[in-house]
């Protein structure tokens, strides 16, 4: 099913139509890789948003607008960034992979000589150890044991790989690369990966991001040809829903997608962002979405030409954040309304 309906009543999801602005200079070092902000629960009074600028990783606390540098400067300009499971990790153009542990220890690894396009972090069910999945241009996903700083194994593919996501229960993984193919892996009790299905997103182009829903029922694939494919894990042959962005590629290429985080409660939302100016908040109960448009930052340029360098939910699902070159924009979710009327049958 392909739909392109827009929800005219933003109050279905949002408390504010005009976003708050926070000072954060975010930059991308690759025109296709624009998934460069992230957050996680740190146990602090408010959780930071991580972002990259040049060879540095920063974190901003939106409540106070305090900005802090994470660790030392890197030896590379990051293409990928993620904060999860207590870790913060960044990947580079020549196989570099740096991460900070929960104790702030910084580790540097050289994994290959190709781009590290995407990072996923999860804890294994077998021993609760944290491991990273790094999607690379050498046709592999590398599995790194973050507890010991060791490359544990490599999964091999027929194309450059761009992104992977692990389900919240740790039982399966989906990944995508420079083709329409979507690879579905089972993760067994010992932590090993087994390819179970290969399906195709509703695209003829490369895909750059994946996300798995809160209850592990759905997963989404964001593609370069301006399409977003949503699959039901029980029916992998074809997508159950396809959304198209507001414009054709390259401006309308979808560069990131994120389901409501596990700590957010039953909000049933999916955030996805184009490469320029427009993000969308999809209501999974109705299939309708709300456009989130970046405000004009420069009177000499069209608002439709502003780069988006990443988007994410707050860890508790209370807000969504979208990053431009100069600001982090925040829209607040109407959580009370969403949770008061939850849905147990999506779409």
From Swiss-Prot:
It is found in: Cytoplasm; Nucleus. Coiled coil: none annotated. It comes from the Eukaryota. One of its GO terms (cellular component) is nucleus. Pfam families: DUF2415. Keywords: Cytoplasm, Nucleus. SUPFAM superfamilies: Putative isomerase YbhE. PANTHER family: DUF2415 DOMAIN-CONTAINING PROTEIN, WD REPEAT PROTEIN (AFU_ORTHOLOGUE AFUA_8G05640)-RELATED. This is Uncharacterized protein C4G3.03. It comes from Schizosaccharomyces pombe (strain 972 / ATCC 24843) (Fission yeast).
């Amino acid at each position: 099913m392909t739909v392109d309906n827009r929800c005219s009543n933003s109050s279905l999801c949002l408390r504010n139509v005009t976003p708050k602005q926070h000072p954060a200079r975010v930059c991308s070092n690759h025109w296709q890789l624009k998934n460069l902000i992230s957050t996680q629960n740190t146990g602090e009074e408010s959780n930071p948003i991580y972002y990259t600028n040049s060879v540095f990783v920063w974190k901003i606390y939106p409540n106070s607008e305090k900005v802090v540098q994470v660790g030392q400067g890197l030896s590379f300009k990051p293409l990928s960034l993620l904060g999860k499971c207590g870790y913060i990790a960044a990947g580079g153009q020549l196989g570099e992979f740096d991460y900070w542990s929960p104790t702030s220890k910084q580790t540097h690894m050289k994994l290959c000589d190709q781009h590290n396009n995407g990072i996923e972090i999860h804890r294994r069910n077998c021993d609760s150890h944290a491991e990273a999945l790094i999607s690379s241009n050498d046709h592999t996903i590398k599995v790194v044991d973050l507890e010991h700083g060791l490359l544990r194994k490599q999964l091999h593919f027929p194309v450059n790989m761009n992104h992977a996501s692990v389900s919240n229960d740790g039982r399966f993984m989906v990944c995508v690369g420079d083709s329409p193919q979507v690879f579905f892996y089972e993760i067994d009790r010992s932590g090993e990966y087994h390819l179970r299905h290969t399906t195709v997103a509703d695209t003829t182009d490369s895909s750059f991001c994946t996300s798995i829903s809160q209850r592990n029922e759905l997963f989404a694939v964001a593609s370069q040809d301006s399409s977003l494919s949503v699959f039901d894990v029980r029916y992998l042959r074809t997508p159950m829903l396809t959304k198209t962005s507001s414009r054709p590629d390259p401006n309308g290429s979808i560069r990131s997608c994120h389901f409501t985080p596990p700590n957010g409660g039953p909000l049933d939302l999916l955030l996805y962002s184009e490469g320029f100016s427009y993000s969308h908040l999809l209501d999974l109960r109705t299939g309708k979405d709300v456009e989130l448009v970046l405000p004009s930052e420069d009177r000499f340029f069209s608002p439709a030409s502003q780069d988006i360098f990443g988007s994410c939910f707050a860890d508790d699902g209370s807000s969504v954040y979208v990053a431009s070159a100069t600001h982090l924009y925040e829209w607040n979710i109407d959580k009370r309304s969403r949770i008061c009327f939850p849905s147990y049958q999506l779409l």
